[in-house]
């Protein structure tokens, strides 16, 4: 594997972490204490940095950054061609105690001072330079992070700065009134997880096929646009997440290319807003869930939808909300969750606990949040009773446990899958039979389809289900669905009926699988080891089929404890990764 790109991406991320801060525009406290050691800010000044509405408890520590020196604007003939505001090339992280006293950070990685990247050579021609990147990297690698005495730590930071730049803090400051700026520390640490992952990948001697496919320079073979018969008679299209509208032509063409056996493991979908990319992604997820239940039912997939963009994540979370019963609207038992307290198909992996009332959330790898509340064997009988009541009411059955329910569901699902194949064959024969007979394929067609019912009989049987017919009648009010060719009309009918049914049957199968796995798990002996943690993720995936996270947060969730390593990456644990707004990643 060519690792040059990995090194480049890592360095770009490191540079972004060391970007310049516009401290003149931020809430700050300015200390003008000459050559004295900064040891505190006044207690009354703390709200200037941490407004009262956003403060933690009064007895909690807070993270701050201190700028001990300033790069002043340079003027010539009364004007400057460069930055005309002060800039701060060096930042020291610290802890602010409740009384305003400064303390060395508890986390050793936060004790390493930050040289802002734009001031280190090589840099842009119009940026000023304080030191070289190579020299700074060497000095930082030798910096002592064990020191906890504030006075000695501050002295070590100044020595580091002087070794790199040849200047003291006092010499790079206002001549008459030197100042030290204190600001709230930015939210940090997310990028560190990604940087750690880069380091492990750069050291790894194992094969990582998907990553190798992404970074190799060889151009992929372009797939041809599929023929109409392949588009509308797609025999691997088994599921739809929505039963209200069928796929559009472009969505159906894209799905045909995606499910083509020769398709790459990395599949890009482009299109302006409003062209149906989200609906297509929902179809991919629905299809994957159904295929998994029917083809390897004992191994639930881990599906992740991710993005670098917070707004995109919010949109994804909304897309996986399950419609709840409301006044005046009849309850559709099929499309409700058959486990208590669930109104979504998506689990949000994020540490933002202020959003816990909006979404089902997992805050960390310990499972704080929804997992620890829900993934609880003590609630097993509650789940089993709730599920069986919904299951037996919907199917008019009398199943006694989740395993019986799964057998019942999978039998029905296989029958529906076969029915989809029959419908496509019948529509294909009706539309293309004469054309193929003219080409001499009649005898083979007759042998293949001699046991098939007629197209008219298939449609008649299909319309016996009042719900299907009602949805179809609403659709054909629109001219685009009237008088369609047989295969296109059949594709529309299947989207709003059998494919939609299969998706929800698969969801309810996975709910039963969650109950079965919860009954068998040993929560007391469960660890964060590779096997236990992967098993827990799969169990959660039975309840929440889609995990949703930003790319900044995701790496910290996909780690386990392995051979004494507390953050060993779970390589290849994700079965399907969907990247929204991928151009921003």
Regions found by a protein language model. Name each.
Residues 244-265, 549-550:
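N-terminal pre-P-loop "Q-motif" helix
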Residues 197-243, 450-573:
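Conserved helicase NTPase catalytic core signature
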Residues 1-236:
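N-terminal accessory nucleic-acid engagement/regulatory domains that precede
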Residues 1-99, 103-106, 346-490, 494, ...:
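Charged C-terminal transducer/switch regions of large nucleotide-driven machines
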Residues 267-286, 296-316, 548:
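Conserved RecA-like ASCE P-loop NTPase motor core of nucleic-acid helicases/translocases
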Residues 312-342:
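Conserved helix-turn-beta segment of the N-terminal RecA-like "Helicase ATP-binding" lobe
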């Amino acid at each position: 594997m060519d690792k040059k790109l990995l090194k480049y991406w890592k360095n770009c991320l490191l540079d972004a972490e060391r970007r310049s801060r516009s401290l003149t525009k931020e809430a700050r406290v300015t200390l003008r204490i000459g050559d004295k050691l900064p040891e505190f800010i006044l207690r009354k000044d703390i709200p200037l940095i941490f407004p009262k509405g956003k403060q933690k408890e009064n007895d909690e520590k807070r993270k701050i950054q201190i700028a001990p020196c300033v790069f002043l604007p340079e003027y010539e003939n009364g004007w400057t061609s460069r930055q005309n505001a002060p800039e701060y090339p060096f930042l020291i992280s610290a802890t602010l105690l409740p009384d305003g006293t400064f303390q060395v950070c508890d986390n050793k990685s936060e004790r390493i001072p930050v040289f802002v990247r734009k001031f280190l050579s090589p840099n842009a021609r119009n940026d000023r330079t304080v030191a070289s990147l190579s020299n700074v990297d060497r000095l930082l690698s030798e910096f002592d992070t064990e020191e906890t005495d504030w006075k000695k730590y501050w002295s070590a930071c100044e020595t580091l700065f002087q070794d790199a730049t040849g200047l003291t803090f006092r010499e790079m400051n206002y001549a008459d009134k030197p100042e030290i700026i204190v600001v709230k520390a930015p939210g940090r640490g997310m990028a560190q997880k990604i940087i750690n992952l880069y380091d492990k990948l750069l050291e790894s001697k194992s094969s990582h096929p998907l990553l190798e496919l992404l970074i190799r320079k060889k151009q992929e073979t372009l797939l041809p646009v599929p023929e109409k018969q392949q588009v509308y008679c797609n025999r691997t299209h088994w599921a739809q997440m929505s039963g209200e509208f069928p796929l559009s032509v472009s969505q159906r063409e894209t799905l045909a290319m995606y499910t083509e056996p020769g398709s790459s493991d990395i599949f890009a979908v482009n299109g302006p807003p409003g062209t149906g990319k989200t609906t297509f992604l929902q179809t991919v997820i629905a299809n994957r869930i159904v295929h998994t239940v029917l083809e390897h039912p004992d191994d639930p997939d881990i599906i992740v939808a991710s993005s670098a963009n917070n707004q995109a994540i919010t949109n994804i979370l909304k897309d996986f909300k399950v419609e709840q019963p409301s006044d005046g609207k009849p309850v559709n038992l099929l499309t409700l969750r058959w486990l208590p307290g669930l109104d979504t198909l998506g689990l949000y992996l994020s540490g933002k606990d202020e959003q816990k009332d909006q979404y089902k959330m997992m805050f960390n790898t310990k499972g704080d949040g929804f997992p620890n509340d829900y993934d609880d064997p003590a609630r097993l009988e509650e789940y089993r009773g709730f599920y069986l009541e919904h299951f037996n009411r919907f199917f008019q059955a009398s199943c006694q446990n989740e395993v019986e329910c799964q057998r019942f569901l999978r039998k029905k699902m296989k029958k529906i899958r076969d029915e989809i194949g029959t419908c496509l064959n019948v529509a294909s024969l009706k539309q293309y039979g004469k054309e193929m007979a003219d080409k001499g394929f009649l005898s083979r067609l007759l042998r293949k389809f001699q046991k098939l019912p007629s197209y008219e009989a298939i449609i008649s049987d299909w319309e016996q289900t009042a719900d299907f017919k009602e949805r179809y009648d609403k659709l054909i009010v629109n001219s685009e669905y009237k008088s369609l060719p047989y295969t296109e009309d059949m594709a529309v009918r299947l989207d709003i009926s059998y494919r939609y049914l299969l998706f929800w049957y698969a969801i309810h199968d996975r709910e039963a699988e969650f109950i079965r796995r919860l009954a068998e798990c040993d929560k007391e002996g469960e660890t964060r080891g590779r096997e236990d943690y992967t098993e827990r993720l799969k169990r959660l995936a039975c309840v929440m089929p889609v995990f949703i996270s930003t790319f900044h947060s995701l790496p910290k969730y996909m780690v386990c404890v392995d051979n004494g390593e507390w953050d060993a990456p779970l390589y290849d644990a994700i079965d399907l990764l969907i990247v929204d707004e991928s151009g921003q990643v």
